[in-house]
């Protein structure tokens, strides 16, 4: 029987390379206090408190997670991104902050600001670094949150990753359907499906 050690709403769960389930973040009930921890299922130890989840609450719900080819875990939350060690979950790399909207750099990509993320396709012989694409989001709701009309890409495993802003080719909107965002978010042909 699998059971969470911390009750949580709005977490992200991901199957790790070893088959375990990583559960990250959330709140204790709808609009409840933050649960700034991560845990593994089946249980292998205590929950681990993450400073970056505490610091960016409440703009880090449903953080974006991906297992990287190098074995690390890419995590994007609010307007920040890191790579975690897949064994002890310490931060092995801090990426530069993601650009937000042109008029408000404080814009974020994770819930409740509501952006989305996908891994970019790789092609044989798979020697190029893995890319990630994050689209949409909004500025914080204080003062009337506005949708972010761009996408950002990076290659997290590069020696010095940088974020590249990709302008959406349609009007600004918060995108919840990644397939649609993927087709419409970039003028760069290599990101367009055939």
Where do the model's predicted regions map?
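Beta-propeller domains
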Residues: 56-193
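Asp-box/WD-like beta-propeller blade repeats and closely related beta-sheet repeat scaffolds
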Residues: 1-63
């Amino acid at each position: 029987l699998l059971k969470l050690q911390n009750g949580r709403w709005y977490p992200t769960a991901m199957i790790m390379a070893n088959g375990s389930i990583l559960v990250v973040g959330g709140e204790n009930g709808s609009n409840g206090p933050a649960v700034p921890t991560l845990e593994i299922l089946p249980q292998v130890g205590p929950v681990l408190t993450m400073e970056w989840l505490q610091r960016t609450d409440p703009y880090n719900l449903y953080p974006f997670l991906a297992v990287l080819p190098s074995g690390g875990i890419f995590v994007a939350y609010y307007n920040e991104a890191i790579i975690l060690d897949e064994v002890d979950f310490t931060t092995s790399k801090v990426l530069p902050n993601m650009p937000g909207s042109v008029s408000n750099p404080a814009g974020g990509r994770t819930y409740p600001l509501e952006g989305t993320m996908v891994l970019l396709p790789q092609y044989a012989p798979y020697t190029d670094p893995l890319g990630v694409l994050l689209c949409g989001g909004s500025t914080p709701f204080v003062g009337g949150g506005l949708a972010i009309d761009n996408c950002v890409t990076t290659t997290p495993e590069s020696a010095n990753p940088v974020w590249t802003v990709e302008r959406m080719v349609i009007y600004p909107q918060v995108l919840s359907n990644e397939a649609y965002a993927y087709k419409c978010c970039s003028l760069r042909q290599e990101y367009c499906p055939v």
